[in-house]
Amino acid sequence: MSKNLLLIFTRNPELGKVKTRLAKSIGNDKALKVYIELLNQTKRFTENLPCDKIVYYSENINCKDIWDLHTYRKELQSGNDLGNRMANAFKQGFSEAYDKIIIIGSDLYDLTSDIILEAFERLDSNDVVLGPATDGGYYLLGMKELIPSIFRNKEWGTASVFSSTLKDIADKKVFLTKELNDIDVVTDMENHPVLNSFL
């Protein structure tokens, strides 16, 4: 067992339930195809990372999807909002004696294994690692112990999440990774020829 754990939060890829903001512009069918490609990309840059990995599903666990059971453990998200679900996943990980835990989503095409590896390394000398997203949220969060305030009193999915989180950890030593753009609306896809092929 590694002492490092990567949590990957996903939505079950079901028509009409993923990338709903994107779907308003390109329709549910294409939005689903884009999300499936984002899931595949997430698998590509995480599968060879030297850490333990858990995929957290939003609705139900699929034992026969792209996530290989030899590489990824599978769990179901639990909680009444995103903050609660993430907090519960971190709690579970720390209860299993992991030293460093990082959580990512599954809607970034530009996230790389190197960014995640650096985030784990930076936790040696920092309390928190945070990856800012261009929309005002964050795409990566890493900790060595649970900091409950991070997950409370947030307007999840809005542009205030990143700045609000920084206020919660003002007394902690924080490292920020490079800013990345998650894929939520059509303009987010402009620099990605692979994703543009779905338009």
Please place each PLM-identified region on the residue numbering.
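N-terminal nucleotide-binding beta1-loop-alpha1 segment
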Residues: 1-21
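A short, N-terminal amphipathic alpha-helix
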Residues: 33-51
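Acidic donor-binding segment of Leloir-type glycosyltransferases
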Residues: 50-72
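Short phosphate-binding loop-to-helix
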Residues: 68-100, 158
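Short aromatic-hydrophobic micro-motifs that form the base-stacking/packing surface
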Residues: 102-104
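Conserved donor-nucleotide/metal-binding helix-loop-beta segment in metal-dependent transferases, i.e.
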Residues: 111-137
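Short, glycine-/small-residue-rich phosphate/pyrophosphate-handling segment
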Residues: 147-166
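Conserved alpha/beta core of the MobA/IspD/sugar-nucleotide pyrophosphorylase nucleotidyltransferase superfamily
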Residues: 163-199
